Amino acid sequence: MKAVVLAVALVFLTGSQAWHVWQQDEPQSRWDKVKDFATVYVDAVKDSGRDYVSQFESSSLGKQLNLNLLENWDTLGTTVGQLQERLGPLTRDFWDNLEKETDWLRQEMNKDLEEVKQNVQPYLDEFQKKWNEDVELYRQRVAPLGAELHESARQKLQELQGKLSPVAEEFRDRMRTHVDALRTQLAPHSDKLRESLAQRLAELKSNPTLNEYHTRAKTHLNTFGEKARPALEDLRHTLIPILDTLKTKVKSVIDKARETLTAQ
């Protein structure tokens, strides 16, 4: 029940992104999210791609062309894996530097959110209390009706529905009243949070350190590019022979087909 109340408050305030403020566990870092997504995506592409290549080579056309695509695919997969291993530390270092540079802003935003959380907590507690009271009242009023249905289900089904409908409507109306009251109570805090966020953004734009941060971010990107260049060059050198081999074999097949057509 408490999770429901918190979820309602989050919808009224800042949306699902504010959920981390109420979570006890630390949210997953940006680098971990990027790394996990990239790993899953690349693995899926490698697995599905290899299946397609294998199916093609097993076909009559694939056997006739004899391009050795599966062998080249495995070589490419190994090279990509090595590239991931070499770029992994560089990428993590880039994100670490970026997080350090923006840590002060994140701390200020967390302070604002924590202040709003403390201010709205009494309203959430009151909302939860009323919610529990109405749920218990509804349960007490419905329980006897359930007993009647159990005693003579077929005979009293229509009568039970007639008794239950007003109770359900009353419960629904009471819940709507509580939700509307909570929305009204939280509205000023929601406005305050939006104003605070707008103020932080304005301070960020006028802050002299913004240009310094931009320079640092550019430096980090340049450093990352310089360190990643050797690994990308290795990948390019690995791909060139594979592409040249495929090009030669395809050209040979086309030439043979042209000779066959000319002879006919």
UniProtKB/Swiss-Prot annotation:
Residues 67-264 are annotated as: 10 X approximate tandem repeats. GO terms for molecular function: amyloid-beta binding; apolipoprotein A-I receptor binding; chemorepellent activity; cholesterol binding; cholesterol transfer activity; enzyme binding; heat shock protein binding; high-density lipoprotein particle binding. Glycosylated. Palmitoylated. Sequence repeats lie at residues 67-88, 89-110, 111-121, 122-143, 144-165, 166-187, 188-207, 208-229, 230-240, 241-264. Its main location: secreted. Keywords: Cholesterol metabolism, Glycoprotein, HDL, Lipid metabolism, Lipid transport, Lipoprotein, Oxidation, Palmitate, Phosphoprotein, Repeat, Secreted, Signal, Steroid metabolism, Sterol metabolism, Transport. It comes from the Eukaryota. The modification Methionine sulfoxide is found at residue 109. Pfam families: Apolipoprotein. One of its GO terms (biological process) is blood vessel endothelial cell migration. The keyword rRNA-binding does not apply. Residues 1-18 form the signal peptide. The keyword Kinase does not apply. It is found in: Secreted. GO terms for cellular component: chylomicron; endocytic vesicle; extracellular vesicle; low-density lipoprotein particle; spherical high-density lipoprotein particle; very-low-density lipoprotein particle. PANTHER family: APOLIPOPROTEIN, APOLIPOPROTEIN A-I. Homodimer. Interacts with APOA1BP and CLU. Component of a sperm activating protein complex (SPAP), consisting of APOA1, an immunoglobulin heavy chain, an immunoglobulin light chain and albumin. Interacts with NDRG1. Interacts with SCGB3A2. Interacts with NAXE and YJEFN3. Participates in the reverse transport of cholesterol from tissues to the liver for excretion by promoting cholesterol efflux from tissues and by acting as a cofactor for the lecithin cholesterol acyltransferase (LCAT). As part of the SPAP complex, activates spermatozoa motility. Belongs to the apolipoprotein A1/A4/E family. This is Apolipoprotein A-I. The gene is Apoa1.
